[in-house]
C-alpha cells in the first residue's frame, strides 16, 4: 500500500477545516484554504491570528487536531514533514536556515544531498549553477553564510527550495530582516516561482508588502478566516484596510 491515506480528484495544496489548540486555547478554528500551482496566495492577519500555526499544520511541523491537508488530492494529514517534502511541499521558515559556516555554493550542494538529488539535475535548465545565476548569487558563490546580508540569505534560501523541485512552497515572513531594496528583488523571485508553475503560500506582518504579488488573499483573525478575495477586494474592504493595512 502507498503511504497516502486517501485520494480525491482535486488538485492544489488544500486545507479543509484544520483546527489546532494549545493548552485549551483554540488557536486555529476550522481553516480552509487552497493554493493552486502557478499562483501566489497570501495569508494575512495581525500577530496572534494563527498564521504560523496554519503554516505548521500545512508543512507537518504541527499536527492538526482535526481537518485534512491534501497535496494534489492526496491526504498528507498524518504524514511527517519529510514525507510531505517528497510529495512536493517545501517550507521557508521565518528564521534564517542558512548554514553560516558554509559557502553559498556548499549550501546548495548540501540541500541537494539532503534531498538525494544530483546537482547536475537541478535548476531552471539543469544545474545548481543555473540556480546561482537565477537568484543573483553567482558572484558570491564562495562567500560564507555568516557574511551574507539579509536579502542575500533569503535569495539563497529560495534557491535551496528549488533544489527539491517542489510543486508548492510555504514562505513564512520572507521579508523579515530584509532591506526595502532587497524586498523588491525577492518579490520578483517569488513571482518567478509562480511563473515556473509552483504554487506559493506567503505570509508577512506587513500585508501591503505582499498584496502586489498575490493572486488571492486570505485574511485571518482570532484563528479563523474572515475574508477571502483578490488583492483589489482585500484592499477595498474597510475592515481589512483599517485593521491590517493601517489605513
Q: For each predicted feature, which ranges?
A:
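Conserved ABC ATPase "signature" region
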Residues: 121-140, 187-191, 239
Amino acid at each position: 500500500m502507498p503511504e497516502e491515506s486517501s485520494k480525491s480528484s482535486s488538485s492544489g495544496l488544500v486545507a479543509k477545516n484544520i483546527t489546532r489548540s494549545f493548552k485549551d486555547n483554540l488557536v486555529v478554528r476550522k481553516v480552509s484554504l487552497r493554493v493552486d500551482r502557478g499562483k501566489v496566495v497570501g495569508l494575512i492577519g495581525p500577530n496572534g491570528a494563527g498564521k504560523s500555526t496554519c503554516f505548521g499544520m500545512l508543512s507537518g511541523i504541527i499536527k492538526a487536531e482535526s481537518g485534512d491537508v491534501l497535496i494534489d488530492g492526496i491526504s498528507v494529514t498524518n504524514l511527517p514533514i519529510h514525507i510531505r517534502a517528497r510529495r512536493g511541499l517545501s517550507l521557508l521558515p521565518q528564521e534564517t536556515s542558512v548554514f553560516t559556516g558554509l559557502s553559498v555554493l556548499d549550501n546548495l550542494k548540501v540541500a541537494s544531498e539532503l534531498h538525494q538529488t544530483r546537482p547536475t539535475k537541478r535548476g531552471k535548465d539543469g544545474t545548481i549553477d543555473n540556480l546561482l545565476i537565477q537568484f543573483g548569487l553567482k558572484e558570491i558563490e564562495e562567500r560564507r553564510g555568516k557574511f551574507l546580508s539579509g536579502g542575500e540569505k533569503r535569495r539563497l534560501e529560495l534557491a535551496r527550495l528549488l533544489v527539491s523541485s517542489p510543486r508548492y512552497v510555504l514562505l513564512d515572513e520572507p521579508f523579515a530582516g530584509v532591506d526595502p531594496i532587497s524586498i523588491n528583488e525577492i518579490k520578483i523571485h517569488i513571482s518567478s516561482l509562480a511563473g515556473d508553475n509552483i504554487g506559493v503560500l506567503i505570509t508577512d506582518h506587513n500585508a501591503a508588502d505582499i498584496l502586489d504579488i498575490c493572486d488571492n488573499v486570505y485574511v485571518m483573525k482570532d484563528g479563523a478566516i474572515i475574508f477571502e478575495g483578490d488583492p483589489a477586494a482585500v484592499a477595498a474592504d474597510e475592515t481589512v484596510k483599517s485593521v491590517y493595512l493601517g489605513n
